[in-house]
Amino acid sequence: MLQRLSQSIKGFAARFPKIYNKGNGSVQQTILQASQRLNELTGYSSIEALKNAVVKQETKLRDFRLSAAEARKRYIEAVEKRSSSQREVNELLQRRSSWSTIDLERFTKLYRDDYSNKEEEIKAQEDVDVAERRVEEAQNGLVRSILSRYHEEQVWSDKIRQASTWGTWGLMGINVVLFVVVQLILEPRKRKRLVREAVDHIDKERELEINDELKKISEKLDKKGEAVGQALELTSPKIDNKNLPKNSASLILPPINYDTFHSFLDSLKYFLSRFLSTDYRIQLTYRQLSILATKFTVGGGVIIYTFIHLFGLAFKR
């Protein structure tokens, strides 16, 4: 197993440089393509072309200068060669009376070479003139390329600066609009929602407290009502239900629900509708009457307390 692991590690180590070079090459190619695309979008590709033209013109000027230097060197050599030949001819002419056969042959050869030396000097002079004209033209072309590149760079920088200025103003406008929207629309809605939620929460807590108090009061009243009813039942005469007419309907008093405020109001409405109905005859005992009076008293007090409490909450808001 260790041998397989070591072989796998060695294989990965051998493949890692290839993987790295491949990944690095793809990343560099992607960056280069993205850079070229950005230059095309911003118009910088034309400036890159002018830069390349300037570099080519500099290379051309350098080559022409080398050619001109070589032409001047050949011209100087041709002039020196002709001058040397003329000096030797002059020396031979000065001692013409004592020429030998060798001197005569030398003079003849120098006289013939003088024509070719003159032709070489003229040709070298022409080459120098041509090379200097080429150098001058290349130098003028280089100056024009540099000026054109400088002009295009200035135009491009002005465009970028203008676009940057408009972009900055656009971002500032968006920020101002967002600030106005947030401060004038979103924040008031958020505050209203928070206030509404807080008020609803407080109202629910108040309602729960009122319901708890109503339940406690209802329990106490039920206990007191039962005690009062038992006492009145013991001291009051008994009513015979048989003396009532047979066609009369006896009304059984509905109970009042004190669980919640809404249930209390509903049960009170139902009780009043039954109590004020003309189709029923009410038969009450002293106990029921006392309980009823107690419930009405307590119910009225609870209603008054509730309304006062609600008005107090309204004024606090």
Swiss-Prot record:
Residues 316-317 are mitochondrial matrix. Residues 187-294 are mitochondrial intermembrane. It comes from the Eukaryota. Pfam families: She9_MDM33. It is found in: Mitochondrion inner membrane. One of its GO terms (biological process) is inner mitochondrial membrane organization. GO terms for cellular component: mitochondrial inner membrane; mitochondrion. Its main location: mitochondrion. The keyword Metal-binding does not apply. It is a multi-pass membrane protein. Keywords: Coiled coil, Membrane, Mitochondrion, Mitochondrion inner membrane, Transit peptide, Transmembrane, Transmembrane helix. Residues 45-145 form a coiled coil. The chain crosses the membrane at residues 166-186, 295-315. Required for the maintenance of the structure of the mitochondrial inner membrane. Involved in mitochondrial morphology. Causes growth arrest when highly overexpressed. PANTHER family: SENSITIVE TO HIGH EXPRESSION PROTEIN 9, MITOCHONDRIAL. Belongs to the SHE9 family. Homooligomer. This is Sensitive to high expression protein 9 homolog, mitochondrial. It comes from Schizosaccharomyces pombe (strain 972 / ATCC 24843). The gene is she9.
